[in-house]
C-alpha cells in the first residue's frame, strides 16, 4: 500500500507535538509483522521509536473490527484523547456505536463495500495540511 499524500509528514508532526501514534491494522503478526514494519519504515514513517506503536492482530482469525475496537477501548484507559483515522466503514461504524468518545475520521479510499460510513463523520482524501495549523 502506498501512503496517502501528506501522511508521513502528518504522523511526524503529531509526534513532534508529543502525540502517541498507533498504527492499528487488521494484519496479523505471524504472517505480516516483518513486512508491515519494513513497509512503514521504507516509506518514511517512524517505527520502533518511543511514542510510536505498531499494533497488529495476534492471529489472523480475529475479526478486524472487533480487534480494533478492543485495542481502542484499552487506549482510552491511558490517553485523554483518542482518534481513529480509518478507511473501512465497518470498523468506523462499530467504534462510533461502542466508543462514542473516540474521534473518528473516514479516509475516503478503497474499502470492502460491506457498509457505508455515517454522513456525520469527518472525511479526508489525503493528509496534506500546513503542519503549523495543527
What spans do the regions from the language model cover?
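Metal-dependent phosphoesterase signature
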Residues: 1-5
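Catalytic-core regions built around general acid/base machinery
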Residues: 6-18
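C-terminal cap/substrate-recognition subdomain and adjoining C-terminal extension
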Residues: 17-20, 28-134
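Conserved phosphate-coupling serine/threonine residues in phosphotransfer and NTP-handling enzymes
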Residues: 25
Amino acid at each position: 500500500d502506498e501512503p496517502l499524500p501528506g501522511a508521513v509528514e502528518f504522523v511526524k508532526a503529531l509526534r513532534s507535538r508529543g502525540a502517541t501514534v498507533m498504527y492499528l491494522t487488521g494484519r496479523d503478526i505471524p504472517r505480516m509483522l516483518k513486512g508491515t514494519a519494513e513497509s512503514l519504515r521504507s516509506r518514511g514513517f517512524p517505527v520502533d521509536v518511543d511514542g510510536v506503536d505498531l499494533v497488529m492482530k495476534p492471529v489472523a482469525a480475529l475479526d478486524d473490527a472487533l480487534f480494533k475496537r478492543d485495542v481502542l477501548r484499552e487506549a482510552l484507559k491511558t490517553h485523554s484523547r483518542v482518534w481513529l483515522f480509518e478507511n473501512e466503514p465497518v470498523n468506523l461504524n462499530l467504534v462510533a456505536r461502542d466508543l462514542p468518545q473516540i474521534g473518528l475520521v473516514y479516509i475516503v479510499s478503497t474499502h470492502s463495500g460491506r457498509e457505508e460510513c455515517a454522513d456525520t463523520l469527518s472525511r479526508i482524501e489525503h493528509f496534506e495540511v500546513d503542519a503549523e495549523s495543527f
